[in-house]
Regions:
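Glycine-rich N-terminal segment of FAD-binding domains in flavoprotein oxidoreductases
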Residues: 1
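Flexible, glycine/charged-enriched surface loops at secondary-structure junctions
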Residues: 24-28, 135-138, 144-165
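FAD-binding subdomain of flavoenzyme oxidoreductases
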Residues: 6, 11-141
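Phosphate/diphosphate-binding loops
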Residues: 58, 182-184
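Short glycine/threonine-rich loop-to-helix capping motif typified by GTGT followed
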Residues: 162-181
Length: 184
């Protein structure tokens, strides 16, 4: 598990894990390396690592409530903060989910479980030369995902606009056409 605060991005966590020799995977999304780990988890984001449900991988959180008081899980409040980091369900009612997609508090910290890096990772890229091939490709992808659970970690379909959004800032207004779109 790793504990992060607002502003820690996928890229920052990847650098930290690499620099410290930790063989764990970053819970990545299709949003790219500048995406916030905490924000994505609170929005119930998902990704292509074994812990694909990012909020599902959150084991503990800390938040500031509207009256200025702090929310911590029951295990945390009982003086067992380390246990709270490791045991998601704690004791008593589970209320951490109230802080997802809501305004019940400002989450200042989450602890999230990371999956170990596999012995090997392979990436397969393919191109569909025609839009007509998308539907049969999606059907085949569904088939592969159901036949290879645990082996095939995830599929991420992207077009050039998606790749551009992940790797470059949004273009200035002067670079867009009259409809506000990027020219081909």
């Amino acid at each position: 598990v790793v504990t992060v605060e607002p502003g820690v991005t996928q890229g920052m966590l990847a650098v930290f894990l690499d620099e410290h020799g930790h063989d764990f995977m970053v819970p990545v999304t299709g949003a790219g390396p500048t995406c916030s780990i905490l924000a994505n988890a609170l929005e119930r984001g998902y990704g292509s690592t074994p812990h694909s449900d990012h909020f599902g991988a959150v084991t503990d959180l800390v938040a500031v409530l509207a009256d200025g008081s702090w929310y911590r899980s029951a295990l945390h409040e009982a003086g067992t903060a380390e246990l709270a980091r490791l045991f998601k369900w704690g004791i008593g009612p589970y209320v951490n989910g109230l802080f997802t997609q809501s305004g019940f508090g400002v989450v200042t910290q989450i602890t999230i479980a990371l999956a170990r890096k596999p012995e090997t990772t392979k990436i397969c890229l393919f191109n569909l030369p025609s839009d007509d091939l998308l539907e049969p490709a999606v059907d085949k992808i569904r088939e592969l995902l159901s036949e290879l659970p645990g082996i095939l970690g995830g599929i991420n379909l992207m077009n050039r606009h998606r790749v551009l959004a992940m790797t470059a800032p949004y273009p200035a207004a002067s670079e867009l056409d009259s409809r506000g779109l990027m020219p081909e």
